[in-house]
Regions:
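C-terminal alpha-helix plus adjacent terminal tail
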Residues: 1-28
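Fe-S-dependent hydro-lyases/dehydratases of central metabolism
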Residues: 29-488
Length: 488
């Protein structure tokens, strides 16, 4: 069986080897059948370590203003430098104000200091920062693919749990802590134990108004929020191959809610078409060479995974969460289960057996690294056009990047949202998490395209129902949790 093994690598990758436009390098060898994950892992092993761990080469590092300055300042205080600034990027996204006319001021107390310190630290280290007013500013997991920073076969890390989003491009991408970011910037490597492998196959064709968000919530509801623990998950099957790149990013984004190390999808012609011409992607002869490598990344047909899960995509329905974990989700036309934990019911203000559809809501949010891309906004706008949201409802739309915002405005989507009664904002993480400063009213019940429905996630004592952009738009119009299939 033809497979891969890593070419010899230096323990200190240079800009030429792993810079802003480089790609991982493999050479063909005979070995056991391999998965996509196995190929990328083996290609990046610098050396095996004691205790069953490996020293892995890291191709891309992304920082944000909440923790980036701390990692860079700690590095400087230790007398160390960033080994290769060309492969490190930073962005202001987590705590920036998303209201129109924003400045460095933030709703988070002391937030401006994080932004100021990030500017100074990245400037001193020679790192490219996508700052508040930069035309490429946006949520890290939105702008990295937009700019072609993430590439098939690459390793990419960031101090954010949803870094797995970028596995949609056939990359090995995962979230880390600040101390790991510091180590990776100084050495170009990280010490890791190889996780197990899992393949989740979605067979068949998705029904109308059923989205990648619904696929992810269905998986987590059936197999638990810890179902992917200790594994790198590859998503496969007819329904996955049919997704566009933005849909694939949504699916991989939710892998961390499944407790997986990462989520991945093998690159194909859709992947390559997306990346072609992107700023940090290879070009010219390097592009052709990269394509030749990328086309050989897919898992071997007879590759063995440690665990397999199969789901009939054709039987899925729009999903919505009812509790305080993504695993507590059900079809929109379903009910709160009879065995729901009483503590969760007391917090969320629902009773077991109650129908989800028709549950009154106070607010609606469209945004986050899960569902803030152009296709997400188009889907929501298709339901909102010519309609008005329910009276008294607060509704907010936050594009995932400045580029998404510009493209949406060029299509007139901003007018559709505004005329329907939504606020139209600047790009950023915004209402995804209360710690960023932006929030809904205390105790508000919100239907949201975000990825987490933990207690007080979007405001003090708030209740969050996570769903797709279509379900959020339909619910905003109805003033209660609603089925988008009944409005489309």
């Amino acid at each position: 069986m033809a497979s891969w093994k890593p070419a010899r690598r230096s323990t200190k990758p240079s800009s030429a080897a792993i810079g802003a436009r480089s790609k991982p390098r493999w050479r063909l060898a005979l070995s056991e059948p391999q998965t996509l994950f196995d190929r990328i892992w083996q290609a990046h092993v610098v050396a095996p370590l004691d205790g069953g761990a490996d020293l892995l080469a890291i191709d891309r590092i992304f920082l944000h203003e909440r923790t980036g300055a701390a990692a860079l300042n700690a590095l400087a205080a230790a007398g160390r430098k960033v080994a290769d600034p060309a492969r490190v990027f930073a962005v202001t996204d987590h705590i920036v104000d998303t209201r129109p006319g924003r400045t460095d001021q933030t709703l988070m107390p002391g937030g401006q200091a994080f932004i100021t310190e990030t500017r100074a630290a990245t400037l001193a280290a020679g790192i490219r920062l996508f700052d508040v007013t930069d035309p490429d500013q946006g949520i890290v997991h939105v702008i990295s693919p937009e700019l072609g920073i993430v590439l098939p076969g690459a390793t990419l890390i960031a101090p954010d749990s949803h870094t797995c989003t970028q596995g949609a491009f056939g990359a090995l991408a995962w979230g880390i802590g600040s101390s790991e970011a510091e180590h990776a910037m100084a050495t170009g490597t990280l010490r890791l134990k190889k996780p197990g492998t899992m393949r989740v196959t979605f067979a068949g064709v998705l029904p109308a108004m059923v989205t990648p968000k619904d696929m992810a919530l269905a998986l987590i509801a059936r197999h638990g929020a810890g179902g992917g623990a200790g594994h790198a998950v590859e998503f496969a099957g007819e329904a996955v191959r049919a997704l566009d790149m933005e849909g694939r990013m949504t699916l991989c984004n939710m892998a961390t809610e499944f407790a997986a190390m990462t989520g991945m999808i093998a690159p194909d012609e859709k992947t390559f078409a997306w990346l072609a011409g992107r700023r940090y992607a290879p070009s010219g002869p390097q592009w052709e060479a990269a394509l030749a490598q990328w086309r050989m990344l897919a898992s071997d047909p007879d590759a063995r995974f440690d665990r397999e899960i199969g789901i009939d995509a054709g039987a899925l329905a729009p999903m919505v969460s009812w509790g305080t974990s993504p695993e507590q989700s059900a079809p929109i036309d379903g009910c709160v289960p009879p065995d729901a934990p009483q503590r969760v019911l007391d917090y969320i203000g629902l009773a077991s057996g109650v129908q989800l559809k028709g549950t009154a809501i106070d607010a609606a949010f469209i945004g986050s690294c899960t569902n803030s891309r152009l296709s997400d906004l188009r889907q929501a706008a298709s339901l909102l056009q010519g309609r008005r949201i329910a009276q008294g409802l607060k509704a907010i739309c936050v594009p995932g990047s400045s580029q998404v915002k510009r493209e949406a405005e060029a299509e007139g989507l901003d007018r559709i949202f505004i005329e329907a009664g939504f606020e139209w904002r600047e790009s950023g993480c915004s209402m995804c998490f209360y710690a960023g400063g932006e929030s809904f009213a205390p105790g508000a019940r919100v239907v949201s395209t975000t990825n987490r429905n933990f207690e007080s996630r979007q405001g003090p004592n708030g209740n969050t129902h996570i769903a797709s952009p279509a379900t959020v738009a339909a619910s905003a119009l109805a003033g209660c949790l609603a089925d988008p299939r009944e409005i489309a």
